Regions:
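N-proximal helix/coil linker or "cap" segments that precede and/or mark the start of modular domains
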Residues: 26-53, 176-178, 193
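Thiol-/selenol-based redox modules, centered on thioredoxin-like
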Residues: 158-203
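A short beta-strand-turn-helix
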Residues: 49-70
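Thioredoxin-like thiol-disulfide oxidoreductase module
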Residues: 112-149, 154
Length: 203
């Protein structure tokens, strides 16, 4: 028996249902993407999808930050003499603990332009991430941390609370304090680093 058009579509839909299939009778609106989960939800509100970059300049997914409990923000610049001494020491710390640690370091450039920033990251062989030069989030983070100089290192916990900032102590470089705070929080031996200002000669 030949089915008339008015009865064909309902019957076809019934067959699809019995087979466990869905008949696409009308286009549906795509479901909204779920909100990012993890740490640093408050901080990441100010970040765009391309705000964070690798040493090569490629965008890095924000999830890489959200997966880390602690965040270090490192302010530095290519033409800063003290930075030339502090940066290698920080790289040494990063390479020793990054694979097993629960932190990430984000470099914020104090250089005059993006090209100089890229040169600095390349020449220093920085292994960590960076905030894209000129990104709107830069000013917000500076205001949040009340950063007024460099080299400066700050440490935030998973709730984006500032738990360590540069300060004098035991003769260490002022920005070594956040490293010691992180070591204490993770039950690791606290290392001290005496900053030799005489080493600035020739830089």
């Amino acid at each position: 028996m030949k089915l008339r058009a008015p009865f064909a579509l309902p019957l076809l839909a019934t067959v699809f249902v019995l087979l466990g299939l869905h008949l696409p009778l009308a286009a549906q609106t795509p479901a909204p993407k779920p909100a990012p989960t993890g740490f640093h939800a408050d901080l990441l509100k100010d970040f765009k999808s391309n705000s964070i970059i690798s040493g090569s300049g490629s965008p890095v997914p924000l999830k890489r930050i959200a997966d880390k409990k602690y965040l270090f923000f490192y302010f530095s610049g290519k033409y800063c003499a003290p930075c030339k001494i502090f940066t290698p020491k920080l790289i040494e710390f990063y390479k020793k603990h990054a694979k097993t640690g629960n932190f990430e370091i984000i470099f914020i450039s104090e250089d005059p332009d993006a090209d100089t920033m890229r040169q600095y990251m390349s020449e220093a062989s920085m292994p960590w991430l960076a905030l894209r030069f000129g990104d709107p989030a830069v000013k917000k983070i500076k205001d949040r941390l009340q950063q007024k100089g460099f080299p400066m290192l700050f440490l935030l916990d998973e709730n984006d609370e500032l738990i360590a900032k540069p300060e004098l102590g035991d003769g260490d470089h002022v920005s070594w304090n956040p490293v010691k705070v992180w070591q204490k929080a993770n039950n690791l031996p606290v290392t001290h680093w005496k900053f030799d200002y005489k080493a600035l000669q020739g830089h």
